[in-house]
């Protein structure tokens, strides 16, 4: 059951937002890489619709995969995957390189957001980590990737 003061809103984030200024206390978005045409406009609209002292939270996953022991080369399967997404994003004008190009921080600052906090988290893929929590994350990410590959 949702709290009485909670509503979920859905709209096309590429358009002018339908809500008036100072509407929301909290805006949460995630995984919009490859979806937004104009990141600066997106952040301006979020800032405009957020109440003074409101909170905006945006989570994104980078596509610039790395390996602690090396081994991800441009011709490897993962390297080709990253290259294909980078090229596709350029062709449609909707980048997948939001994290790698620093678009979140740049866009939020330009829109007027203050007190920005950026967290870059390590996200393993597979069961290789020895840390139990990272191992669990790695197994979940493996399932997410395998489940989503068909749709990509």
Protein language model regions, located:
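A short beta-strand submotif of the Rossmann-like class I SAM-dependent methyltransferase core
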Residues: 29-32
């Amino acid at each position: 059951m949702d709290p009485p003061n909670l509503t979920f809103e859905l709209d096309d984030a590429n358009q002018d937002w339908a809500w008036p200024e100072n509407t929301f206390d909290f805006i949460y978005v995630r995984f919009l890489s490859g979806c937004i045409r104009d990141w600066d406009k997106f952040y301006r609209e979020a800032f405009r619709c957020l109440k003074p002292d409101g909170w905006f939270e945006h989570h994104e996953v980078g596509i610039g995969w790395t390996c602690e022991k090396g081994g991800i080369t441009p011709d490897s399967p993962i390297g080709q995957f990253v290259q294909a997404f980078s090229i596709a994003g350029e062709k449609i004008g909707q980048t997948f390189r939001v994290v790698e190009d620093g678009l979140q921080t740049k866009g939020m600052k330009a829109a007027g957001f203050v007190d920005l906090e950026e967290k870059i988290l390590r996200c393993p893929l597979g069961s290789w980590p020895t840390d139990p929590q990272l191992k669990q994350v790695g197994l979940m990410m493996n399932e997410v990737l395998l489940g989503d590959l068909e749709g990509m």
